[in-house]
Amino acid sequence: MVNMKASMFLTFAGLVLLLVVCYASESEEKEFPKEMLSSIFAVDNDFKQEERDCAGYMRECKEKLCCSGYVCSSRWKWCVLPAPWRR
């Protein structure tokens, strides 16, 4: 009877240990793609900002000219889409 209780306890402890190891491994795997994607997009955004000499949509246009397809709003000093009612 004691031997059966000990074997059940060891089996239960082994399953708990296996669960903890699997959870830790899975959480590491989930973090890796997130870190990889965030580093790719961070580098990509930095590259785009260095490449531009013009201001994009809803960016300040006091010192920079707006990119093609946008006009500088005289009221807000932001680059906006051109429209007939904006003069």
Curated annotation (Swiss-Prot):
The keyword Signal applies. GO terms for molecular function: ion channel inhibitor activity; toxin activity. Keywords: Disulfide bond, Ion channel impairing toxin, Knottin, Secreted, Signal, Toxin. InterPro entries: Huwentoxin-1, Huwentoxin_CS1. The keyword Metal-binding does not apply. Disulfide bonds join 54-67, 61-72, 66-79. Pfam families: Toxin_12. Residues 1-24 form the signal peptide. Expressed by the venom gland. It is found in: Secreted. One of its GO terms (cellular component) is extracellular region. Belongs to the neurotoxin 10 (Hwtx-1) family. 51 (Hntx-8) subfamily. Hntx-8 sub-subfamily. The presence of a 'disulfide through disulfide knot' structurally defines this protein as a knottin. Ion channel inhibitor. This is U3-theraphotoxin-Hhn1a 15.
